[in-house]
Amino acid sequence: MVLDKILRAGEGRILRKLKAIAEQVNLIEDDFTGLSDGELRGMTDEFRQRLADGKETLDDLLPEAFAAVREAARRTLGQRHFDVQIMGGAALHLGNIAEMKTGEGKTLVSTLPTYLNALAGKGVHVITVNDYLAQRDAENMGRVHRFLGLTVGVIHPQMPPPVRRAQYACDITYGTNNEFGFDYLRDNMAWSSEELVQRGHNFAVVDEVDSILIDEARTPLIISGPADHPTRWYTEFARIAPLLERDVDYEVEEGKRTVAITESGVEKVEDQLGIENLYESVNTPLVGYLNNSLKAKELYKRDKDYIVTDGEVLIVDEFTGRVLHGRRYSEGMHQAIEAKEKVEIKQENQTLATITLQNYFRLYDKLSGMTGTAMTEAAEFHQIYSLGVVPIPTNKPMVRLDQPDVVYKTEIAKFDAVVEDIAERHEKGQPVLVGTTSVEKSEYLSKQLRKRGVPHEVLNAKHHEREAAIIAEAGRKGAVTVATNMAGRGTDIMLGGNPEFIAQAELRQRGLSPIETPEDYEAAWQEALEKARQSVKAEHEEVVDAGGLYVLGTERHESRRIDNQLRGRAGRQGDRGESRFYLSLGDDLMRLFNAAAVEGIMDRLNIPEDVPIESKIVTRAIRSAQTQVEGQNFEIRKNVLKYDEVMNKQRTVIYEERRKVLGGADLHEQVRHFVDDTVEGYVRGATADGYPEEWDLDTLWTALGQLYPVGVVAPDVDDRDGLTADHLLEDIQVDAQEAYDRRELDLGDGPDSEPIMRELERRVVLAVLDRKWREHLYEMDYLQEGIGLRAMGQRDPLVEYQREGFDMFQTMMEGIKEESVRLLFNVEVQVAGQEEAATSVGVEPAVSAAPAPPAAAATLPAPAVPTIPDGAGPVADAQPVRPAAARQTPPPPSPVPSAPLPVFVKGLEPRRPTGGLRYTAPSVDGGSGPVTTVDGRSGLGRPAGDGALSAARGEAGTAQPGAGTRPARNAPCPCGSGRKYKRCHGDPARRNTE
């Protein structure tokens, strides 16, 4: 509260500054009104030239630029920016969040700062909440920008990279937060500079900024590749979960969305599985399957959190009510739901690239946003994004009547009252917008309305294709619209009908488009708009007389902002309107907290079920519940950010290194340092004991022989008098550098050798960098999963995560150096037009990318080389599914960028994606986010057979690691536990105790 007061202390001063800017624009408005279309368009070139001369800044140009946009909007859209919209545009340009009430024209406001900042030529991004709004705004608001000579682009999920790159090259680019974020991650997985699509992060305007930066910030963006195939455990635990009784065998805390198994439940599970101890180390993975199956049973409800269509589980976004097509929960949650619903269980995934929305948006040099509900989260915007919130006055006074909540004892009684209220309003011609919290409840209410004979439209996740059309008609006389939360954002509800929507629909029917036929579209626009305005004018007056739009909420949301967004649909631009919430003690929000106490009071007072109550106790309980949930969610978002700060610093280092390589940087000196550092690590490790007679020189020579063709004769060095570690290091470093010179000469003939080696360095370093980074992400995921347990040992989990994460990053960087050096000395290279050069490759690089040692060391045992987690590489690594034994060989490293030189590195040639990448984006709760599948084809993985099930049951024939060939560290453990070998029987600590 104190911080809120501090943040609001300067509001009056800021508003006075914004009002002064609006007055400046008004003073010069007539100067622009008198310009011809060509002269007005020519102002863009003049502004750019004045910027290029360096004598004026964007702030200096603001009044004139805003006046130009205001006039262009009047000529193209038939809309003139109000003074409060000019104020909002100035607030956005200055890097603030403009809080503007629903119906105040936020979309039109965005044209002002986007035009001004696009003059700098660095690109402007406009971020919306869904693809429909991005396409719509790019077309409609793009008319203003195109009229002024700017280019406008829009990105959507299925757009190919060349087209996507062209859209980013435009002056202004529209798209969703997920698309912008995933493009950033994909750019940092690119194989060549030609594949990059984004051109920097200059200025962004985020529409519905609270939804994107607050509601959706609990889940990071993740690109993942195929991991293991699903096992039978999902089906097994889907069978067991219904046998367990809530509050007896397990406990549920809905507020935190957690489940906890009790001793009774553990005994029942052990009995069902036929095992002695569920928490024995070999059975540890089963606990995760059990928890997910119980969450699927209790916390994920069909037709609320997801729907099942054509044998597929589709997530429903809690905040918008939309179906998130192709998206999936991560960490096995989606598979557990699929098993519960008895549909096909699809495979899990492993992280390849990730970033939180908080850290993505902090990449922008300047960030701004607009929404109707931001002041309640002003402190969070300030703390995390350094954004101020400026409440912009409404153009006309708000006259909406917000009625007090009414509370019923049961949900059935509540809906009966809702139907009666709707029927009465409909009979007198008042339009009604009903907000529900789930698909299930919207369809239940629709069924009740049909019984009552009330005509209505239903807008929920199953009918989102008609969203815009339904909402545009929701303000018509007597209209009744039942909608999930998706109705709250993006499309304006105008009393009597939306003339702009009607005009656009008419022009579309005539085959006109603002993109494809801009001249014909603009010529026909004014006539179509005026015709539509006349058609709705009379009806508008009738609806106003009936009381305006009536917004009826059937349940309170966890967040006050979501409730305010629903209320805000009524009373736009000074129109009459009314709102009311109907509640019951069975509502989700009430059940999360102490609704039982209120129910007890109603029972003692003998209040009938169909009689509502209006009590300060209930009002306080609701307010308290919402405040608690908002506080919990804020802590979740802060916690996500704290942990991602560790990854963000590491990600910045890796991505900067990749960009340097993609940019064609000369890595020669850096690779030379790699050679020296790797050799030094070998020598220091072998000579750590101090005295020469205690040095492990045999191991040193073996390791060096596997690294590069050693020229130093070992006996000569071993027998030297007065040998020191420093002398030994110097001799070997000189020898390694000379070997590198010879390697460069061997790869080319004369002047061609150097460019070939430089290209090889870039390819190898990029391939190793990508592989090691993927492995590191896997390790960091594993670390974060269990780091919370450190609190039991009185240690701060975050501090432990920071410390261990740094150590792991240092280890990864050393591994990048070592593997790069090994590959540069040993990998097979072929230049177009030459015979294939067989340069000391004893194993198949195309499979492992870990070459055998040179011939001189061919008989020495190969050192362990870190491998990619089984099936975890990008889709470019995907191969036809092979038997499990064959798949224990790790896949090849990431493809690397193509280059001007026709150089081919066996096992490292770039290949195009074949499918399998998945994208995790913000979802319905603070837990696992959904994953978007671009190509649904299966990737590599290990099918779970009967051996896996019998292993946990303790039956005869349980697979155990044998004494033969050891699996790769990241391959599935042969015991059938479902864990990686290195985390199961490959764990040295475990082997030592068995």
Swiss-Prot record:
It catalyses: ATP + H2O + cellular proteinSide 1 = ADP + phosphate + cellular proteinSide 2. It is found in: Cell membrane; Cytoplasm. One of its GO terms (biological process) is protein targeting. Pfam families: P-loop_SecA (PF21090), SEC-C (PF02810), SecA_DEAD (PF07517), SecA_PP_bind (PF01043), SecA_SW (PF07516). Residues 889-900 have a biased composition (Pro residues). Its cofactor is Zn(2+). Residues 868-994 are annotated as: Disordered. Belongs to the SecA family. This is Protein translocase subunit SecA. It comes from Frankia casuarinae (strain DSM 45818 / CECT 9043 / HFP020203 / CcI3). The lineage of its organism: Bacteria, Bacillati, Actinomycetota, Actinomycetes, Frankiales.
